[in-house]
Amino acid sequence: MYSSQASAVPNRVVGLISGTSVDGIDAALVEITGTELDLKVELLAGKTYPYPADLRERILAVCAGEAISMLELAHMDDAIALAFAQAAQNIQIGYQPANLIGSHGQTVYHRPPKEAGVGKKNLGYTLQLGRGEMIAYLTGITTVSNFRVADIAVGGHGAPLVPRVDAFLLSHPHESRCIQNLGGIGNLAYIPARTDDWLSQICGWDTGPSNSLLDLAVERLTAGAKTYDEDGQWAASGTPCYPLVEKWLTHEYFHLSPPKSTGRELFGVAYLNQCFQDAEPYQLSPADMLATLTELTVASIVHSYRTFLPQMPQRVFLCGGGSRNLYLKQRLQLALETVPVLTTDEAGVSADFKEAIAFAVLAHWRQLAIPGNLPTATGAPHEVLLGEIHQG
């Protein structure tokens, strides 16, 4: 069991993550006190450190299914670990040093579990590069990494892992909330008002494509000159093609019951190619295409809420890179009608660095032997300790 006395002492932790958009390493330096209902997190510093261009290209190629030798895989693993270690060191400049690092690593492959007959299940699989033992060695700081595998080993999806953190940082005594992450892939945490049984009612899952699909489209439409649509301005100048959105929403993933998870394996380059092929008869302009892909993200989120949530939330809080896409935010607000759409900044948690903050908290919990997963979100049969500890 964890020590309540230890949890009262501020724990200075670095949280690190690079998401499915592969746009860089988000690093957050935080001070944590408490554990669950008394959890308090102060963000001291947050910054995104871009990958070197050649490393990003190699990661994206592997995520798209390109074959790679074991030697190349080892080199990539080392290069990512080095980049994460450097980010951890740089974020601490000017501050007292951290005593713990929580590193998610870089996901390059994710396979959800699959039912294999009555009472049987083929376990999922996940691979995050950027090994924690190397980060611990290079920084001299104890590092927790490989967070997803313990949940997967007992039959869960290993995702989403952030809902338990969201529950203790962003819940409200009288209001139900959805925390909607708009990273490469969209995912939600539904958090009911804090009643007697509120923790058991929390749920979460991946809603579908978000930034990664939009970014891939921008790169394709600009022949690589741009990597994203700033503020969604380009998409905002176009008009969505609703018949295409309706067609794309027939994809089986959107109709799978939660818990569920996905990634670039399903919504990556091959899927985008199919989207462009589907759009050919409509002769859409580049702006129209981006507006239509944005509308798919919005429609998949709203469909998820209306189909699978026990009730619509009273408020939605956005986080992740897509929370800065003003056009996407406006379209989501329009679709959700009277449900206010805000960012987690307005609830006191940085929308840009919430995921990095979450992995700092998960590392803090692992150090105190507190489970980090929520079975109602990941589909695991029970709670488990998340992450492997590497002494610094």
From Swiss-Prot:
InterPro entries: Anhydro_N_Ac-Mur_kinase, ATPase_NBD. Keywords: ATP-binding, Carbohydrate metabolism, Kinase, Nucleotide-binding, Transferase. GO terms for biological process: 1,6-anhydro-N-acetyl-beta-muramic acid catabolic process; amino sugar metabolic process; peptidoglycan turnover. It catalyses: 1,6-anhydro-N-acetyl-beta-muramate + ATP + H2O = N-acetyl-D-muramate 6-phosphate + ADP + H(+). NCBIfam families: PRK09585.2-2 (NF007143), PRK09585.3-2 (NF007148). The gene is anmK. The keyword ATP-binding applies. Pfam families: AnmK. It comes from Nostoc sp. (strain PCC 7120 / SAG 25.82 / UTEX 2576). This is Anhydro-N-acetylmuramic acid kinase.
